[in-house]
Amino acid sequence: MSKNYHIAVLPGDGIGPEVMTQALKVLNAVRNRFAMRITTSHYDVGGAAIDNHGQPLPPATVEGCEQADAVLFGSVGGPKWEHLPPDQQPERGALLPLRKHFKLFSNLRPAKLYQGLEAFCPLRADIAANGFDIQCVRELTGGIYFGQPKGREGSGQYEKAFDTEVYHRFEIERIARIAFESARKRRHKVTSIDKANVLQSSILWREIVNEIATEYPDVELAHMYIDNATMQLIKDPSQFDVLLCSNLFGDILSDECAMITGSMGMLPSASLNEQGFGLYEPAGGSAPDIAGKNIANPIAQILSLALLLRYSLDADDAASAIERAINRALEEGIRTGDLARGAAAVSTDEMGDIIARYVAEGV
């Protein structure tokens, strides 16, 4: 690979900087093994940016992201900044504006039960034994969260509140294509989630997804009502590959997928726009209670890097190398404290070193 790539690195707050350090160790191993020309630039975001620049998303950070091929994001927030007005707090003042600025309309949340971690899965042992590897593809900018009209009116017994579920054809088409393209990189199956037996928006959703499916004859398509999907995820999550969801349904199902893995420290997330530009981050929070103690699990941040390589840099071999290295570490019983259950645990730094070494060795 001879192309030059540039990544904007935004470590953020809490455990963000220390887990980001581990991801950059792994990136260095990827650079060397695959002869990739990747440079990075660091920028403040969230609480760190408030402390250093007086605002959670400084113009220099936005400009740096604009000049990059992708953004590797840590985590933001913490008690230190909770006294600020909501729009000036790290989460709402940084992450949401970044998503809006770069028109990040799709969210990809993988949820995988790794071999050796079945005991952390809250499902029955016989179900957990089958394992699962699911990718939830959620539409981020349409649906009931943004549809108009919305509001409250009236008083007394006549007081009411209302929201409107609205989806346009182009919004459904583009998120469906993201799901089908993702399935092509995985096990070639898409399950589209809707409520087409009740909602007009879901009827349109199903019609358009069926149309897009004709462009992907190599991908199997199934439809499932949201209420059934929530049950099937508990009954047999191994049946799913890619879940295609509207904003509301994806909000619900992606969290359910996360919970059945048993550890938020293992879950990455990607938010993409139509040009393939993406923001990649762990699904968990900044965990200020363990920040600076060298005990945080860096795997979600490292897996976020793998998603970045796969979806924004089209470097699937490098992404797969990271995933294999993580699998090897877990198979060998290497655990940070959140997964140790009383057994010997490695530190944040040690886990990063081990995964980077395994990438370099090509395990």
From Swiss-Prot:
Substrate binds at R99, R109, R138, D227. It is found in: Cytoplasm. GO terms for molecular function: 3-isopropylmalate dehydrogenase activity; magnesium ion binding; NAD binding. Its EC number is 1.1.1.85. Its cofactor is Mg(2+); Mn(2+). Binds 1 Mg(2+) or Mn(2+) ion per subunit. It is an enzyme of class 1 (oxidoreductase). Pathway: Amino-acid biosynthesis; L-leucine biosynthesis; L-leucine from 3-methyl-2-oxobutanoate: step 3/4. It catalyses: (2R,3S)-3-isopropylmalate + NAD(+) = 4-methyl-2-oxopentanoate + CO2 + NADH. One of its GO terms (cellular component) is cytosol. Disulfide bonds: none annotated. Mg(2+) binds at D227, D251, D255. It comes from the Bacteria. Pfam families: Iso_dh. Keywords: Amino-acid biosynthesis, Branched-chain amino acid biosynthesis, Cytoplasm, Leucine biosynthesis, Magnesium, Manganese, Metal-binding, NAD, Oxidoreductase. GO terms for biological process: L-leucine biosynthetic process. Catalyzes the oxidation of 3-carboxy-2-hydroxy-4-methylpentanoate (3-isopropylmalate) to 3-carboxy-4-methyl-2-oxopentanoate. The product decarboxylates to 4-methyl-2 oxopentanoate. Belongs to the isocitrate and isopropylmalate dehydrogenases family. LeuB type 1 subfamily. NCBIfam families: leuB. PANTHER family: 3-ISOPROPYLMALATE DEHYDROGENASE. Homodimer. This is 3-isopropylmalate dehydrogenase. It comes from Shigella flexneri.
